[in-house]
Amino acid sequence: MMKIAILGAMSEEITPLLETLKDYTKIEHANNTYYFAKYKNHELVLAYSKIGKVNSTLSASVMIEKFGAQALLFTGVAGAFNPELEIGDLLYATKLAQYDLDITAFGHPLGFVPGNEIFIKTDEKLNNLALEVAKELNIKLRAGIIATGDEFICDEAKKAKIREIFNADACEMEGASVALVCDALKVPCFILRAMSDKAGEKAEFDFDEFVINSAKISANFVLKMCEKL
């Protein structure tokens, strides 16, 4: 038995899991709600952090440091940068970067600060497990680079710039910060995103239309991973 954290940013990303689990308890802590359940001989702690890097950093830290999570699976949605990605497609991050971390005025590359690398890698064993699950379910799962920042990207020029600098396949607002916490605390991390939009013009309208279904796709996949851990 292990304790597994499942984290999302929005209620839409965690509610499908709670509806499946049904029997859970909850604890209020640090201005958020944490849900606890047993599933396939594992203890789960679930939460949605609220949107953004700071919120997700706080929740990931609480799940590991206070509640003892031994692995963290992030489930949610993202905007597609890679033209081969369609809405609803699943992407797991091999590595992530913060595209809005900017001290380029001092001659450093975008996404870099002293003491940190630009890219944070995720856990190879969890990534391989995800590929096994995808094969069993006959689901297409793509590996790629995710760019994280505190902005919803709905602009073609910004999208092109971030993709060019980081070779990013998708963008979102929490993954890199969660991966950084897990890396620092030596906890295996897996970041899964279902595409909800294409991060360009009118992306906000696609997001509103597809976020719920895309979030369910990601959530169901993560729960299947728990069965294999």
Swiss-Prot record:
Gene3D superfamilies: Nucleoside phosphorylase domain (3.40.50.1580)
Residues annotated as the enzyme's active site: 13 (proton acceptor), 197 (proton donor)
Function, as annotated: Catalyzes the direct conversion of aminodeoxyfutalosine (AFL) into dehypoxanthine futalosine (DHFL) and adenine via the hydrolysis of the N-glycosidic bond; this reaction seems to represent an essential step in the menaquinone biosynthesis pathway in Campylobacter species. Also catalyzes the hydrolysis of 5'-methylthioadenosine (MTA) to adenine and 5'-methylthioribose. Can also probably use S-adenosylhomocysteine (SAH) as substrate, leading to adenine and S-ribosylhomocysteine.
Enzyme Commission numbers on file: 3.2.2.30, 3.2.2.9
Keyword terms: Amino-acid biosynthesis, Hydrolase, Menaquinone biosynthesis, Methionine biosynthesis
Source taxon at top rank: Bacteria
Sequence positions that bind substrate: 79, 153, 173-174
Pfam families given in the database record: PNP_UDP_1
Gene name linked to the record: pfs
Biological process, per Gene Ontology: L-methionine salvage from methylthioadenosine; L-methionine salvage from S-adenosylmethionine; menaquinone biosynthetic process; nucleoside catabolic process
Top class in the EC scheme: hydrolase
Cited PANTHER family: 5'-METHYLTHIOADENOSINE/S-ADENOSYLHOMOCYSTEINE NUCLEOSIDASE (PTHR46832), 5'-METHYLTHIOADENOSINE_S-ADENOSYLHOMOCYSTEINE NUCLEOSIDASE (PTHR46832:SF1)
GO cellular component: cytosol
Family that this chain belongs to: Belongs to the PNP/UDP phosphorylase family.
MF terms in GO: 6-amino-6-deoxyfutalosine hydrolase activity; adenosylhomocysteine nucleosidase activity; methylthioadenosine nucleosidase activity
Descriptive protein name: Aminodeoxyfutalosine nucleosidase
SUBUNIT field: Homodimer.
